[in-house]
A protein has these predicted regions:
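Short alpha-helix
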Residues: 90-113
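A short SAM/SAH-binding and catalytic strip from SAM-dependent methyltransferases
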Residues: 31-46
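A short glycine-rich, Lys/Arg-flanked "PGG" loop and its adjoining helix->strand segment in the class I
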Residues: 47-62
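Acidic carboxylate diad motif detector
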Residues: 65-67
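Class I SAM-dependent methyltransferase SAM/SAH-binding core
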Residues: 1-23
Length: 163
């Protein structure tokens, strides 16, 4: 994702840190903008990670967060028993209100959900570069609105929030 952005934007002040969040040094109030894309649901402590990200962003800076969500607003979260869409490393899938609460609790303000999109088989499919299983293999063949484990099919949301 970073290389695609850099190719088209060509900015010399845009960079990617290819490291796990816990391996980053303490960076206090440094970044103007942080993208957290498809990572949070893999974390065992998502609110702690959000609080850590919030500490890295300058006052007035922004977080852009892409995450799996449930399409409801009850303030609840799915904790898959063992797997979600055949992935063992998915721990928490919040609904929209729950994600907003997590962001506020982590110290962010002006939280906004700017997009909610169901993941499609066209978007995540086998290609010449990736021949492994794809979304079609992760969904219930009898009910494509469910994963093979019986959970709601993947829906992604993008949130913005100010530090």
């Amino acid at each position: 994702q970073y290389l695609a952005l850099q190719k088209y934007l060509g900015l010399d002040n845009l960079f990617c840190i290819p490291a796990g969040f816990e391996r980053l040094p303490a960076i206090d109030r440094y970044f103007d903008l942080v993208f957290c894309m498809g990572i949070l649901y893999h974390r065992k402590s998502p609110v702690e990670m959000l609080a850590g990200i919030q500490q890295m962003i300058r006052p007035g800076g922004m977080l852009v967060l892409d995450n799996l969500v449930l399409e409801s607003s009850h303030g609840m979260c799915l904790f898959p028993e063992s797997r979600y869409a055949k992935m063992r490393n998915v721990f928490f899938i919040p609904d929209l209100k729950c994600m907003e609460s997590w962001l506020l609790r982590a110290g962010f303000s002006s939280v906004s959900c700017v997009d909610v999109t169901k993941t499609t088989k066209e978007e995540q499919r086998k290609t010449d570069w990736i021949q492994t299983e794809s979304l079609a293999d992760f969904l219930d063949p009898a009910d494509p609105d469910r994963t093979v484990e019986g959970y709601p099919a993947p829906v992604r949301a993008v949130f913005t929030a100010c530090a």
